[in-house]
């Protein structure tokens, strides 16, 4: 099952059966004599797995050496016997004068070439340890790559950029988000909007996205991966160029323009990031030097059969330096405010996606990947120390303990974790006919049993509206009116539930078709159909309501910020609860009715004697509802007790609707 160690000169090649085959050949990997300039470079931290800015010296950099302007190429390929730099400048031929020098025994190769200009395409021709096979690889540290289907790296400088977001960054560093509003709009840049059916540039996107986010009232955007990737249908999650801003939408400064404009308009930017696995395309990281390099040496551990990818070797120092540096690259160079770390479960578990007999336990006999655990702890420690307020979010789908617990307390150290349990439970509930919902009431209240075990974000992400899962609006039960009413009550229940929020693009105006990465959202329906326009207005109003009421976010992760009124009314499929703000006077009462019945004189407990008024109602006519609203009426609490409350009121509750009340 496991791979064998490499000794002397052996070509290591993965086989489908999980073993490793060896072919002994002549060792051609001896170090050459290096110049004084080369010897001045220190790779100690990189080789120890402690380098956080490897992109500043690995890859291709325009420099002056011995009074000559040119490019220094540097790469890591420990088992290569020879490496050539090939490209436009030498007709892609393997010539000795373009042969890189091995400058240490750990596999650092380097070469200075004069008179090269920006825009030149290049690759590394890597000869394996035996000298009998050559692979043509893109530069793992390249800042730019060709647009697919072409695969070469492109010589690019990190040009100066005039940032205007200092005020935003200072605020980010000083203030955390736990007690602040966080309402995230997740989007895929290639399909949010298009121009004449083609990709828009980062600059063009900035002209429309910023105004839309401001109009709708979201606090953050989350971009699906924007590093270079060969396959559009992978959405960026199967990457090759970890340091290359995808050429689909432009260049590095184009992306900086987009982020800068978002920040100047007080909109945060999160980025999906994938340190778990990478694609197996021939020009990429896979078998980089003809043998396992960035991936695990043991094939069972390296091969991710479910996704057709390879898992990073998270225990290898040079791979750790590659990934730590990449995380800081996005934070330092592009000012992103946080990384949403993809597929954390795949990293944590040795048996993730594997059957019995397909994996080996760790040294303690368990299924935890000890190297990945250590990697994630170190990653989060680095970002906390050097990221100046940048956050990390874990996409983790199991009950692994301590995801958001501090590293000092033996947690993994993430700031937030997606609440996949809440998402799965509630989405399965809303698809049910209301007749049967009372038998599944626990799907809507169970999340509060573990809500304070982690710092959760409630996600309705891209994964839930593709591959036959149906769009969010189409998951709802009933005819069109009931579907839109169901969407409104569900969204307002989500907004009232403790935890930060995330909603995928298109859900906010009720797009019926599933998300398609090859075309833009169906924006035309907003103009053509009144219900889509009203649904958009509903989400706009709901987002504004969220922002304006600190009780909905100031105590998300404190138990005193939430109190059930009635968690167990399964017979009527109603959930009622109170959200409480920091000063304890800020209180909102939520009554969420998941049936199509109007409940007249519905009794609900209230925290104090006094007068109550309507703060929000999902059934308002302007949102496409039936108009079952309290309006300007005043509801007077009585001393009639209800559940754990000494006082109560009676009110009309709208069908498939949420009524929110507050003290006058």
Swiss-Prot record:
<keyword id="KW-0320">Glycogen biosynthesis</keyword>
<dbReference type="InterPro" id="IPR013780">
    <property type="entry name" value="Glyco_hydro_b"/>
</dbReference>
<feature type="region of interest" description="Disordered">
    <location>
        <begin position="1"/>
        <end position="31"/>
    </location>
</feature>
<dbReference type="Pfam" id="PF02806">
    <property type="entry name" value="Alpha-amylase_C"/>
</dbReference>
<comment type="similarity">
    <text>Belongs to the glycosyl hydrolase 13 family. GlgB subfamily.</text>
</comment>
<comment type="pathway">
    <text>Glycan biosynthesis; glycogen biosynthesis.</text>
</comment>
<dbReference type="InterPro" id="IPR006407">
    <property type="entry name" value="GlgB"/>
</dbReference>
<protein>
    <recommendedName>
        <fullName>1,4-alpha-glucan branching enzyme GlgB 2</fullName>
        <ecNumber>2.4.1.18</ecNumber>
    </recommendedName>
</protein>
<dbReference type="Pfam" id="PF00128">
    <property type="entry name" value="Alpha-amylase"/>
</dbReference>
<dbReference type="InterPro" id="IPR017853">
    <property type="entry name" value="Glycoside_hydrolase_SF"/>
</dbReference>
<feature type="active site" description="Proton donor">
    <location>
        <position position="395"/>
    </location>
</feature>
<dbReference type="GO" id="GO:0004553">
    <property type="term" value="F:hydrolase activity, hydrolyzing O-glycosyl compounds"/>
</dbReference>
<dbReference type="InterPro" id="IPR044143">
    <property type="entry name" value="GlgB_N_E_set_prok"/>
</dbReference>
<dbReference type="InterPro" id="IPR006047">
    <property type="entry name" value="Glyco_hydro_13_cat_dom"/>
</dbReference>
<feature type="compositionally biased region" description="Basic and acidic residues">
    <location>
        <begin position="1"/>
        <end position="17"/>
    </location>
</feature>
<comment type="function">
    <text>Catalyzes the formation of the alpha-1,6-glucosidic linkages in glycogen by scission of a 1,4-alpha-linked oligosaccharide from growing alpha-1,4-glucan chains and the subsequent attachment of the oligosaccharide to the alpha-1,6 position.</text>
</comment>
<keyword id="KW-0119">Carbohydrate metabolism</keyword>
<dbReference type="InterPro" id="IPR006048">
    <property type="entry name" value="A-amylase/branching_C"/>
</dbReference>
<dbReference type="GO" id="GO:0043169">
    <property type="term" value="F:cation binding"/>
</dbReference>
<dbReference type="GO" id="GO:0005829">
    <property type="term" value="C:cytosol"/>
</dbReference>
<keyword id="KW-0808">Transferase</keyword>
<keyword id="KW-0321">Glycogen metabolism</keyword>
<dbReference type="GO" id="GO:0005978">
    <property type="term" value="P:glycogen biosynthetic process"/>
</dbReference>
<dbReference type="InterPro" id="IPR004193">
    <property type="entry name" value="Glyco_hydro_13_N"/>
</dbReference>
<dbReference type="InterPro" id="IPR037439">
    <property type="entry name" value="Branching_enzy"/>
</dbReference>
<comment type="subunit">
    <text>Monomer.</text>
</comment>
<dbReference type="InterPro" id="IPR014756">
    <property type="entry name" value="Ig_E-set"/>
</dbReference>
<dbReference type="GO" id="GO:0003844">
    <property type="term" value="F:1,4-alpha-glucan branching enzyme activity"/>
</dbReference>
<keyword id="KW-0328">Glycosyltransferase</keyword>
<dbReference type="Pfam" id="PF02922">
    <property type="entry name" value="CBM_48"/>
</dbReference>
<feature type="active site" description="Nucleophile">
    <location>
        <position position="342"/>
    </location>
</feature>
<dbReference type="InterPro" id="IPR013783">
    <property type="entry name" value="Ig-like_fold"/>
</dbReference>
